[in-house]
Regions:
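Active-site neighborhood of HAD-like aspartate-dependent phosphohydrolases
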Residues: 17-69
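Anion (oxyanion) recognition and catalysis
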Residues: 42, 97-101, 173
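Substrate-recognition "cap/lid" segment bordering the active-site pocket of phosphatases
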Residues: 110-160, 166-170
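Substrate-recognition element of Asp-dependent hydrolases with the DxDx(T/V) motif
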Residues: 83-88, 92-127
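Asp-based, Mg2+/Mn2+-dependent phosphohydrolase catalytic module
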Residues: 149-155, 159, 165-211
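Short, basic/glycine-rich phosphate-binding loops at helix/coil junctions
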Residues: 64-79, 104-108, 131
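A general structural motif
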Residues: 17-19, 104-106, 156-158, 176
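Short, positively charged and aromatic/hydrophobic N-terminal segments
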Residues: 2, 7-13
Length: 211
């Protein structure tokens, strides 16, 4: 089930489900969006800058990409057929399935993908193909949208919130979620009061250690 932000239903859950629900981003957390986007861009003649891993902003990654065009290019990619075939990020497949199959956790994905219905269907198809029934639902926001509003229904719930964008992880922490930041070159120097992890093995150990 995918839900666009303009028709988003606040999903109700009882206390037993709450304890086994994990909120997570998709790109840069479950899926390797950056690698797939890089391949797609290079096929279209864009070349990577020497320090492309150090910035979150894509116009710093490609020599030919101007800041004013970056969001449009991302939206074009996110609404292309390629978005249905992103690979899993690092060891996410193994540990997401362990958390689900061995410990009963389910994952609600909150992703700033697109409001395009076809793109949303491809995103859910991609996630379910890799992670199966571990995916409880997929909430799709506009391309690059902030997640403040989408996270607000979970205020003070104490749910885990797994992200790679520091601003979104910070918001989760501020409203009472257990934020976990997945480390990348663009965020590795972010100072925060919540855990920063390199892979899903570390996420698994954090969650099971507190279970």
């Amino acid at each position: 089930m995918y839900l666009a932000v303009d028709t988003m239903v606040i999903l109700l859950y009882n206390s037993s489900m709450k304890n086994k629900l994990i909120l997570t981003d998709a790109d840069g957390v479950l899926l390797d969006w950056e690698w797939a986007f890089s391949v797609w861009m290079q096929e279209r003649g864009y070349t990577l800058t020497a320090d492309n891993k150090k910035s979150y902003y894509l116009h710093h990654h490609y020599n030919e990409l101007e800041e004013k065009d970056a969001k449009k290019v991302v939206r074009t990619f996110n609404e292309s057929a390629a978005i249905g075939f992103l690979p899993a990020l690092r060891d996410s497949t193994f540990y997401v399935k362990r958390l689900h199959e061995e410990h009963g956790y389910q994952f609600r994905v909150i992703t700033s993908l697109s409001l395009d219905k076809d793109a949303q269907r491809l995103r859910e198809m991609n996630l379910r193909k890799i992670f199966g029934d571990a995916i409880e639902s997929v909430i799709c926001l506009a391309t690059g949208a902030d997640k403040d509003e989408a996270l607000e229904p979970y205020r003070d719930s104490g749910l885990y919130w797994i992200e790679d964008k520091p601003a979104n992880a910070d918001v989760g922490h501020e409203i009472g979620l257990k934020s976990i930041l997945v480390e990348h070159g663009h965020n590795m120097h972010h100072k925060c009061a919540y855990p920063v992890v390199k892979n899903w093995k570390e996420i698994y150990e954090l969650i099971i250690g507190r279970d």
